[in-house]
Swiss-Prot record:
Function according to Swiss-Prot or TrEMBL: Structural component of the T=16 icosahedral capsid. The capsid is composed of pentamers and hexamers of major capsid protein/MCP, which are linked together by heterotrimers called triplexes. These triplexes are formed by a single molecule of triplex protein 1/TRX1 and two copies of triplex protein 2/TRX2. Additionally, TRX1 is required for efficient transport of TRX2 to the nucleus, which is the site of capsid assembly.
Taxonomy of the source species: Viruses, Duplodnaviria, Heunggongvirae, Peploviricota, Herviviricetes
Family designation: Belongs to the herpesviridae TRX1 protein family.
One cellular component term from this protein's GO annotations in UniProt: host cell nucleus
Cysteine disulfide links: none
Name the UniProt record assigns to this protein: Triplex capsid protein 1
Main location: virion
InterPro entries found in the cross-reference section: Herpes_1 (IPR004999)
Keywords noted in UniProt: Capsid protein, Host nucleus, Virion
Alphabetical list of Pfam families matching this protein: Herpes_VP19C (PF03327)
Gene name tied to this protein: TRX1
Keyword DNA-binding annotated: no
């Protein structure tokens, strides 16, 4: 049986490959380029080219790389020129796309802000602590006048913030315009301000003791009390804290001077992807106070080898002279569209309380003023204008109908019944997310914390539950 001899002329190994006369050994110092230029089905040493004969170049490859084969003369020199031109185009495209990166390297984004250390003292916080950005305080009294129900004391919020400014840094903590600066709020400081609202009272008091001790003694304690009063005044005037706070990032590094701090945090991507700059703890895992952490899957008896979502949750109690605000970090396998029903089950008592007492101390409407829709009176009168179903879209007939304009003051609304609000913080993509419960020492104070490993930040917007 005769067999055909192998052809001596070189053959094209792949349509999308760029063939060159340069041997792989000459490209030993250019491994990335060799991976780009060598086709996936080529042998390790590539095709052997005999003599000075140029390889065959496919039109599709040259067209995609922007090379005109007609402009190149045949031969080894023309082939090398085409190869150099192709490599140059590939490298320029890689530089425009952000450079050659290591395959599989995590992508993350850092953010930085200079802030006063009144509500966020990075020297006293662990790497990986959660930070929130606060809206400018001068906006809050204006929001209170627009959102507070009739009869609520809108001046209560302005007075509470004024008292907080008196205990802030740099004397009064006011800028040249006479108002406070916008800044950052540490999650631990927020938890300490809401310590009275947590069920785990001992763990919450430990967080408060940590803030009072490591933030500046009695001055920090006064700020905690006055910030807590600000939160209650915000609930009273329906300027809910979740509407003026947003996720900033996980703490990585900081530089402090006097009462100012330049804070760097991971706002997107893996928290553990960047270096903290501390030899003893080069990587930062997310650290949450144990009293403010809720494993929703364990509470609802859910389980399985899946990843989990992380949510930031605010809860409110709207009861006259008993307003409360509380903040949690919730871990759950439920996606955002299914979390509201789970929160309703978990905080159902707050929902009932707000529905019953949320409309208290509001100015009611005058008696007997369009309380009910007067359907019986127009229906009984033959002189009342009517409109058939086919004429509903015609303004000529619709405008003649009776207009009912009830007075909704003092009636329950979605805002008076709001008991919680949540926003997605990120995910824990591991099949078995690790949540380590331990006691961390902050100076002389031991605080029960939960350390979350493998958190990937991807913050989303707020959703209110009513």
């Amino acid at each position: 049986m005769k067999t055909k001899p192998l052809p001596t002329a070189p053959m094209a190994w792949a349509e999308s490959a760029v063939e060159t006369t340069t041997s792989p050994r000459e490209l030993a110092g250019h491994a990335p380029l060799r991976r780009v230029l060598r086709p996936p089905i080529a042998r390790r040493d590539g095709p052997v080219l005999l003599g000075d004969r140029a390889p065959r170049r496919t039109a599709s490859t040259m067209w995609l790389l922007g090379i005109d084969p007609a402009e190149s003369s045949p031969g080894t020199r023309a082939t090398r020129d085409d190869t150099e031109q192709a490599v140059d185009k590939i490298l320029r495209g890689a530089r425009r796309a952000g450079g050659l990166t290591v395959p599989g390297a995590p992508r993350y984004h850092l953010t930085r802000q200079v802030t006063l250390t009144d509500l966020c003292q990075p020297n006293a916080e662990p790497a990986g602590a959660l930070l929130l950005a606060l809206r400018h305080p001068t906006d809050l009294p204006h929001l209170a006048r627009h959102r507070a129900p009739p009869g609520r004391q809108t001046e209560r919020l302005a007075e509470a913030w004024g008292q907080l400014l008196e205990a802030s840094a740099l004397g009064s903590g006011r800028a040249e315009s006479g108002c406070a600066r916008a800044g950052l709020v540490s999650f631990n400081f927020l938890v300490a301000a809401c310590a009275a609202a947590y069920d785990a009272r001992d763990a919450a008091e430990a967080v408060r003791a940590h803030i009072t001790t490591n933030y500046g003694g009695t001055r920090a304690g006064a700020r905690l009390d006055r910030f807590s009063e600000c939160l209650r005044a915000m609930v009273h005037t329906h300027v809910f804290p979740h509407e003026v706070m947003r996720f900033f990032g996980g703490l990585v590094s900081w530089v402090t001077q006097d009462e100012l701090a330049s804070v760097t945090a991971v706002c997107s991507g893996p928290q553990e992807a960047t270096h903290t700059g501390h030899p003893g703890r080069p990587r930062s895992a997310v650290t949450i106070p144990a009293c403010a952490f809720v494993d929703l899957d364990a509470e609802l008896c859910l389980g399985g080898p899946w990843g989990a979502f992380l949510y930031l949750v605010f809860t409110y109690r709207q009861c006259r002279d008993q307003e409360l605000c509380c903040v949690y970090v919730v871990k759950s396998q439920l996606p955002p569209r299914g979390l509201e029903a789970a929160l309703e089950r978990l905080f159902g008592r707050l929902r009932i309380t707000n529905t019953i007492h949320g409309a208290e101390d509001m100015t009611p409407p005058p008696p007997n003023r369009n309380v009910d829709f007067p359907l019986a009176v127009p229906a009984a009168s033959s002189q009342s204008p009517r409109c058939s179903a086919s004429q509903v879209t015609n303004p000529q007939f619709v405008d003649r109908l009776y207009r009912w304009q009830p007075d909704l003051r003092g009636r329950p609304t979605a805002r008076t019944c709001t008991y919680a609000a949540f926003a997605e913080l990120g995910v824990m993509p591991d099949d078995s997310p690790r949540c380590l419960h331990r006691t961390e020492r902050f100076g002389a104070v031991g605080v029960p914390v939960v350390i979350l490993e493998g958190v990937v930040w991807r913050a989303a917007g707020w959703r209110a539950c009513a």
